[in-house]
Structures are given as structure tokens and as C-alpha cells.
Amino acid sequence: MKIQLLLYLMTISLTSCMVKPTIATNEDISIQPVLITSNTRSNISMMASAQGKLIVDKSGCIRLGDETAPLIIWPYGSKLENLGNGKFKITNGFTNQSAVIGEQISLGGGLYEVKSTQVTPSISKACADYGYWLAGPMEVK
């Protein structure tokens, strides 16, 4: 059982380094973004890093780079704030750093292929097609 768990964790660690998002265009958001957050408070995260533009796809899913990038699952305590005029700010619950959707960021964490049930709100089918990025520390570029 311990060997299976170790292999599982090694697989997640290795796949977390394989994300390479591309850059999407910058436009005001006409769809209400859906901030998916972990239900579990933690002070650790995976160690991979991805960089790109924080975007919202046509279904309201928040991604990094383009509409085929993994859905971002934000740390426990993360917040979404409507700034008006189609602008939204996300405050990362892991580091308390904030970024406006459309900004270039670097986001720590790692790729996760299994749909998590330990999130709020539940992940919709429209957001579940391209895997998940379990977010850690964030830095605005």
C-alpha cells in the first residue's frame, strides 16, 4: 500500500512539470468567472511553476494561458472580487497576492488529472476537459 501511494505521488510530481500554457488575448470579461477553491487549508503546494495570462473561458472557467489550459483550483481562502467594467481580481489564499484577470502571472502548484470533489463550488462539466492546476504561490509579472 505504501509503495502504491509513493508511486502515485511520484506520478503527480512528474506530471506537474509538464504544463506549458500559451498566451491569450487581453479583453474585458463579459462572463462571470467561477472561482474554484480547495476545501482543504494547507501551507504546502506542489513545486512546478506555470506562466501566462490569467483568463476566463466562455464557460466562466479560470485558466492560465488559453481555453485548453487546465482549470485552476485556487488555494483555500482565495477570493474573487468584481472591480466593475468587466474587471475581476483574484486574491490567492496561499500568499494573499492579488492579480486582475488578464494580467501575466507566474503560478506555482502542479498538474492534477483527477477531478477533485474537495472543492467549492463543484467543478462543472464545462470546466473539466483539460485537467486541473492545483495552485500554490502566485506572482504578478
Locate predicted features:
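Bacterial signal peptide processing site
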Residues: 18-20
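C-terminal partner/receptor-binding element of secreted or periplasmic proteins
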Residues: 118-141
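Flexible glycine-rich surface loops and low-complexity tracts that mediate binding to linear polymers
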Residues: 88-125
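Short aromatic-glycine-enriched beta-strand elements
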Residues: 58-64
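Short boundary/loop segments of OB/S1/cold-shock single-stranded nucleic-acid-binding domains
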Residues: 29-46
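Sec-dependent signal peptide recognition
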Residues: 2-8
